[in-house]
């Protein structure tokens, strides 16, 4: 069986705990391919989908939306992403829905794969923040698209929110587009050899290392959801 995991840096797993590697260790005999691209957005996933289709997968999971969501939170981020991917149109919730629907349609039309769309992880761990609520709004878009396209929906965002609600802790750090949390986490990991869980703990974070990328608990939630899809296929 061949499983392709499509996504952004959270899937790529260089500056985030790597859920794709978790799946590889849990699913011996299964080929698990990492199709994550750092900074990716839904429009660019649609543009590069031939790379996925051409590999004749049995299962395709799509976890995209974090960068789309951040683009709707600030013009500076939006401009950087538009320029990076040379996008003709602004990034928006409506555009995200259209792109995700087109991704699902093409995968259905051009592969025999079982398809699963995953709601985006949380941005920050403050349940009352605009950033976290925005990811939940984008998660609802994913749920609706999956229902309309008759593909599987994996409720990652909902599971993360439930985990944070149960923990009932006030985070010490918060998501900000101009935060140095992500680059300093990367420096600690690559130059000092600190694990992502250690970095998260030092910042009082439960699921993320820098309010965007994931520690092993957060990545493990994704692996759990995808493993369930693969084992039932």
Task: Identify the residue ranges that each predicted region occupies.
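Nucleotide donor/acceptor-binding cores
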Residues: 1, 30, 113
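Alpha-helical cap/lid subdomain in secreted, periplasmic
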Residues: 18, 22-26, 46-233
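Short histidine/acidic/glycine/proline-rich micro-motifs that form metal-
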Residues: 9-12, 36-40, 122-125
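Residues that form or flank phosphate/diphosphate-binding pockets in enzymes
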Residues: 14, 43-44
